[in-house]
């Protein structure tokens, strides 16, 4: 669809519920994700205690030229329902909207 301001290029299948997207210093996309949307919905409605968290990195080089990599995946016991992943130096800061803290993860 074209509205004069934006042209559609492509969809990128990620196999997870992508939430907020951030960029690193070289242009990779980072996102906090919900790998199980049914568990996330139940968690958001207060029907489950935890929901899994996932962080993905997308190296986008152009149309049909990208890689999607899971860099963090856990069952929600460390942090439920990650909604953002912000790279900073060799760290990733991850947060969600339900907790009053965020994670600091170190990349190796």
Segments predicted by a language model, with ranges:
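Blade-level signature of beta-propeller repeat domains, shared across WD40, Kelch, NHL, RCC1
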Residues: 76-108
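Short N-terminal helix-initiation segments at or just after the protein's N-terminus
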Residues: 1-7, 30-34
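Short loop/turn segments immediately following beta-strands, especially the blade-tip
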Residues: 1-4, 57-64, 106-108
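Structural signature of WD-repeat beta-propeller blades
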Residues: 10, 19, 80-83
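Loop/turn-rich, solvent-exposed surfaces of beta-rich toroidal or solenoidal domains
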Residues: 14-73
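A structural motif specific to WD40 beta-propellers
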Residues: 7-9, 69
